[in-house]
Amino acid sequence: MQNKSFFVRDESNHEIIHPTSSAVGPWDPSMMHGRVLCGLVVQGAEEKLASIDEIDLYQAARVTVDMFRFPAMKPLKILTEIVRDGKRIKVIDVHIMSVNDDQIIEIVKGSVVWLLKTEDTKGKVWMPDEWNFTPPSKDLPFFDEATLDNPGHQNPIWETLDPETGKQFQLNNQTEKNGPKTAWIRETHDFIEDEETSSLLRVAQVADYANPLANLSNIGLEYINVDVTLYLQRNPIGEWIGVETLYHGASMGVSVGSMNIYDSNGRIGMSTVAGLAQAKSMK
């Protein structure tokens, strides 16, 4: 992973984190990206669970992220609350607070449902077919600007490969492609400076990709998502995470989009987003 991060901790108060320029979203230069907000929810939930139990005993089966206020590029504080502490089920709510001078405002509410890992059942259950794409090489070097199809722009905050060709691409350049979309995604940034980024945190960020993957039209992305719901049966293995369009539907300016999520060993879950129509599309 390249030596960049989305956030840095405040030197005088480690409970406060500051977004870096890498955390800027595509809709407004003063607005944080939805993917990093998803990451913050998982960051807070993982820290809270680790404080009360052995985190490896549980699987984050569902992550929900509600983004209901403008996420300004301001300092943030993460508040967490254990709402259920059972032996098999633990639920942790996460509140992302924007710290603006003396005013603290909640901009995101998330929840993570943790289920105790046990053994699989013995019966056979029907499952839909999975994609059949070879994952990228573990040794594939990170791209630089010279190899990207967006000359003159900074390196993206994640890398995207076409599973069919193995070549890198930018989804916004795929408006002429009509039909289901697929991609392999690899993170290029650390989440918080000098802190390890967990596999769950990585896939939580990728979950936000359901919006452009499912909702991209022939003229650009015309919906901004207001939430993310991620379901996982296990965490991803390896750096590359695969995504595949599962559903798109829209009516009266409200959209729903979803995608399947894979790693090198197969499907691991799915992500769904609800969106609002934007008067100006993101191209």
What residue spans do the PLM features occupy?
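Terminal targeting signals and extreme-terminal segments of soluble enzymes
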Residues: M1-K283
